Amino acid sequence: MDKDELKEIIKNLPDNSPKILEYLKLAKEKGWKDIVNMIAQKLGLEEEEKKKTDETDVLKKILKPLGKGKIKGTWDYSVDFVEAKKTLVSAYKQLYDTNLMPYEAYVAILLIQLVNGCRIREAIRAFKTFIESGEREFQLQAQKHGNIRFMIIPDVVKKKATYNAVLTIDDEKLSARIRMFALHYLKANTHSLRYALISYLAKNGIDPAIIAKITGHKRLDRIITYTQTKDAIEMLRKLAD
């Protein structure tokens, strides 16, 4: 079968024909890109691809990289708390207006993580608790060590019927998706949002014991070591300028 013959067959083939996938495989093997596109259009795949491209363009416009570069030996991408909060709040409002799911929920969860200084799985559980109960302030069991920690849902985050779909996604799968989303669009890992709050509070003179209580750290020395390391790195950068 030559290329022109296959084109004629596809033109007259019903959209639901089982043969169409067989012809798609043949066109790919032969390297006939125009026929592959022709079949994709017939199957509606072309529209799906265009939708994904449009979504990517929207996300790139409203989200900006927050990571300033990974600090060697740590998980920290040097995210500024104030800048991150401004970016995520603005992005959430715009996504809320366009109803761009699931990214709207991803940004809401990242914002919850940022303002609570929590782990991504804790932010996911907090978001799900909010969707189910409507409560904005509640206690959750921390991901590590099982400590009980207080969580707050920012006022900007609203309840929406479309968010119920998030309740059906396993926490581990959802956290993996959000981690990929953050790395792609924010150029930072999700844990950097937790570090951003710690740095912000330390710079504002908050007692390490209070910071540990806010962020759910069991060991105070972890907070002290991290803040001292960050201060030392910033001092070296200033000296090098």
Curated annotation (Swiss-Prot):
GO MF, one annotated term: DNA binding
Keywords: DNA integration, DNA recombination, Viral genome integration, Virus entry into host cell
UniProt keyword annotation of Nucleus present: no
Residues of the active site: R119, K144, H191, R194, H217, Y226
Source organism superkingdom: Viruses
The protein, known as: Putative integrase ORF241
Biological process per Gene Ontology, one example term: symbiont entry into host cell
Function statement: This protein may encode an integrase, which is necessary for integration of the viral DNA into host genome.
Cystine bridges: none
Ranges for domain Tyr recombinase: 82-241
Family: Belongs to the 'phage' integrase family.
Species of provenance: Acidianus two-tailed virus
